[in-house]
């Protein structure tokens, strides 16, 4: 198995990416990782000339400030585009990047392409829950608007991922809504509800945003606009809460002593709400795994993203998604007749 890793994207590139790759090839004996980036920066970070860590040299990079479509078309020798093209040309089974999200989605669509039967891809991160199991949220911005049939496809893809990669039997699939009653919501959610109810997965109905971190379900589907709001709210709330705790608990000498005694516990609490161990956000609906690692990913987070990509390839997630979507499409057509 071979994974292409863009080592020029993200806040901690290339050190975090190379460190993670070294750890990953030790953990997975059949894995080769192509490090795509500036060889002058990468080579000193490698312990030796490991044949399982080849370098694809380039000095061109897509910046976070670049316009996605323009950057992908003009910067054809950028580390991100070259990494994605490794998949297109059959030299890699999956690709990972911590760079410009929009550019990665554009490159994935342009070079990897959609699975037949998938109308719109979905960007899907795992978010933390209090029970430490996490939940998959899709879409969080690949498409701002959605149609009912898109949400059905998101549910099929999310269900497949949670079963095959996260090992959850009969994942609970929920529809993000403003209330739990079947008749709640806007035109999109009202039309999507019966499609999801008849889908080939365990649909539990509508779920409210306030219940997500409590582990209300394993897969949450919504349009990209709503999903992005949830994603940013969760990230922002977690950060604000820890800042508040730090401020309030360091006001007095006594409270500072208490913090010192409970430092380990606070670290554990922070870890519960961290996304790092869940890997990156998969761009579901493409012919091969294309995964966006968080821009601030450190080595441990990049490593978990590599492990995520490895499992997706190993479990043939894209093949199963293609089969399940084809079944659902055929079933809908037969009912329409």
UniProtKB/Swiss-Prot annotation:
GO terms for molecular function: phosphate:acyl-[acyl carrier protein] acyltransferase activity. Keywords: Cytoplasm, Lipid biosynthesis, Lipid metabolism, Phospholipid biosynthesis, Phospholipid metabolism, Transferase. It catalyses: a fatty acyl-[ACP] + phosphate = an acyl phosphate + holo-[ACP]. GO terms for biological process: fatty acid biosynthetic process; phospholipid biosynthetic process. Its EC number is 2.3.1.274. It is found in: Cytoplasm. GO terms for cellular component: cytoplasm. The keyword Cytoplasm applies. Pathway: Lipid metabolism; phospholipid metabolism. It is an enzyme of class 2 (transferase). Belongs to the PlsX family. HAMAP family: PlsX. Homodimer. Probably interacts with PlsY. Catalyzes the reversible formation of acyl-phosphate (acyl-PO(4)) from acyl-[acyl-carrier-protein] (acyl-ACP). This enzyme utilizes acyl-ACP as fatty acyl donor, but not acyl-CoA. This is Phosphate acyltransferase. It comes from Halalkalibacterium halodurans (strain ATCC BAA-125 / DSM 18197 / FERM 7344 / JCM 9153 / C-125) (Bacillus halodurans).
């Amino acid at each position: 198995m071979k994974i292409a890793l863009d080592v020029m994207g993200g806040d901690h590139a290339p050190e975090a990416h190379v460190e993670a790759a070294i750890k990953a090839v030790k953990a997975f004996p059949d894995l080769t990782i192509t490090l795509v980036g500036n060889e002058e920066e990468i080579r000193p970070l490698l312990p030796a000339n490991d044949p399982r860590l080849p370098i694809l040299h380039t000095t061109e990079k897509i910046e976070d400030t670049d316009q996605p479509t323009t950057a992908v078309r003009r910067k054809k020798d950028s580390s991100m585009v070259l990494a994605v093209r490794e998949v297109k040309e059959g030299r890699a089974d999956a690709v990972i990047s911590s760079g410009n999200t929009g550019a990665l989605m554009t490159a994935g669509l342009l070079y990897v392409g959609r699975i037949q039967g998938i109308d719109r891809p979905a960007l899907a991160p795992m978010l933390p829950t209090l029970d430490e199991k996490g939940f998959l949220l899709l879409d969080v911005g690949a498409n701002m608007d959605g149609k009912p049939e898109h949400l059905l496809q998101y549910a099929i893809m999310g269900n497949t991922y949670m079963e095959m990669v996260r090992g959850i039997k009969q994942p609970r699939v929920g529809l993000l809504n403003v209330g739990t009653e079947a008749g709640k919501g806007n035109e999109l959610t009202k039309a999507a509800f019966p499609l999801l109810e008849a889908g080939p997965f365990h649909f539990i109905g509508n779920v409210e945003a306030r219940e997500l971190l409590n582990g209300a379900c394993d897969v949450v589907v919504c349009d990209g606009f709503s999903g992005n709001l949830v994603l940013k709210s969760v990230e922002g709330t977690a950060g604000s809460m820890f800042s508040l705790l730090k401020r309030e608990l360091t006001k007095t000498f006594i409270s500072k002593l208490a913090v010192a005694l409970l430092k380990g516990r606070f670290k554990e609490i922070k870890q519960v709400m961290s996304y790092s161990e869940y890997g990156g956000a998969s761009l579901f609906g493409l012919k091969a795994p294309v995964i966006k690692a968080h821009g601030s990913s450190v080595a441990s987070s990049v490593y978990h993203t590599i492990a995520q990509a490895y499992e997706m390839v190993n479990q043939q997630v894209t093949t199963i998604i293609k089969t399940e979507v084809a079944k659902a499409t055929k079933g809908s057509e037969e009912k329409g007749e």
